[in-house]
Regions:
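Flexible, active-site-adjacent loop/turn segments at secondary-structure boundaries
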Residues: 135, 190-191
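Flexible, gly/pro- and Lys/Arg-enriched active-site loops
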Residues: 92-98, 136-159
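Conserved N-terminal beta1-alpha1 strand-loop-helix module at the mouth
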Residues: 1-89, 94, 103-130, 161-162, ...
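Internal alpha/beta core interface subdomains
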Residues: 183-185
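Glycine-rich anion-binding loop/nest that anchors nucleotide
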Residues: 133, 164-170, 187
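Short capping loops/turns at secondary-structure boundaries
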Residues: 114-117, 146-149, 168
Length: 221
């Protein structure tokens, strides 16, 4: 998802944490970006109103993009356009996803998530989004990834050409389980941004594990 020196193995996608202080959030994202390779950053709305969500996005998008990190805004196309984000993360039904892709294809990346089973995932995949996300924002509250997410990610990576992102757990070591599924991306949030953690050190540690343990993708994968 970035333009420079992309590793040919499972890469990190950051999920911005639920923090109301924009200055603190900016500091955390900036520190994480300094820690090493990060493909993209997804900004969930977390139920914020439009004004608060846009302010958060305006604060974070330039920071991430300055480090070559693509930024995806959850669901709100107007905010994504106003802040110059790279794409939109959509969680909803297939027809809504199709409309979004038709409107913004070629101008913004469109990713999706919310699938709870294979049928859900296949239906959304028919719209040909840029990626499929398996997990739920804010639910990486156990050391290991959710077994359902691992199962869906492994099946998807084996059967479907579209890239997928699988939510990791709240410990850095959980990136190994995600990488073992063959998923192109591992999503991290609590493992990076939990109180008392050093985001830069956590990103660096995750990349060390991925470099050592993740399989290399063949050209074109």
């Amino acid at each position: 998802m970035t333009a420079t020196e992309e590793p040919n193995r499972c890469r990190i996608v950051l999920i911005a944490p639920r923090i109301d202080d924009p200055a603190k959030l900016k500091s955390l994202i900036s520190a994480a970006a300094e820690g090493g390779d990060v493909a993209s950053l997804i900004l969930p709305a977390y139920g914020d109103g439009e004004t608060a969500f846009q302010h958060r996005a305006e604060t974070l998008v330039p920071v991430a993009q300055a480090h070559g990190i693509a930024v995806m805004i959850e669901d709100d196309t107007r905010i994504a356009g106003r802040v110059g984000a790279d794409g939109i993360h959509f969680e909803g039904r297939k027809n809504g996803l199709e409309e979004l892709i038709e409107k913004f294809q070629g101008r913004m990346m469109i990713g999706t998530g919310g699938a709870k089973n294979r049928d859900d995932a296949l239906e959304l995949g028919e719209a040909r989004p840029d990626y499929m996300f398996f997990g739920r924002f804010g639910y990486d509250n156990t050391p290991s990834p959710h077994p359902r997410n691992l199962s869906l990610g492994g099946w998807w990576a084996e059967m479907i050409e579209l890239p997928c992102i699988v939510m990791a757990g709240n410990e850095i070591a959980s990136v190994e389980a995600v990488a073992a599924t063959g998923a192109e991306f591992v999503a991290l949030s609590s493992a990076i941004f939990a109180e008392g953690e050093d985001p830069a050190a956590q990103i660096a540690a995750a990349n060390v594990l991925l470099h050592a343990k993740a399989a290399r993708f063949e050209a074109g994968e």
